[in-house]
């Protein structure tokens, strides 16, 4: 997946429901949003009915970009925090966690 495809999926997630507070990208789950305190699956094109570990990792690495410091922190600590922007649409606070 390329950044352009990630941005397209994030846009679909944002447009899927009203009052979205969180976007969730979790192994073994579909893409989900939190709306009014409820987790709701998001139908996207292409569909992601159940994210694989590989798909989730690719998604996270695209959000991290080429930031070596964040990548090293993720590897050494199992998590990293960053911000990500969809120009003209939204800015996100991102928390990436890895399972060992």
What positions do the PLM features span?
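N-terminal "pre-motor" subdomain/linker immediately upstream of P-loop NTPase catalytic cores
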Residues: 1-100
């Amino acid at each position: 997946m390329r950044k352009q495809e990630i941005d397209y999926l994030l846009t679909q997630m944002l447009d899927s429901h009203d009052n979205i507070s969180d976007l969730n990208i979790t192994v073994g789950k579909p893409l989900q949003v939190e709306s009014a305190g409820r987790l709701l699956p998001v139908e996207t094109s292409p569909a992601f009915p159940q994210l694989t570990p590989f798909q989730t990792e690719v998604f996270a690495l695209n959000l991290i970009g080429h930031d070596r410091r964040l990548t090293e922190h993720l590897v050494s600590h199992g998590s990293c925090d960053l911000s990500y922007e969809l120009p003209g649409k939204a800015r996100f606070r991102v928390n990436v966690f890895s399972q060992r």
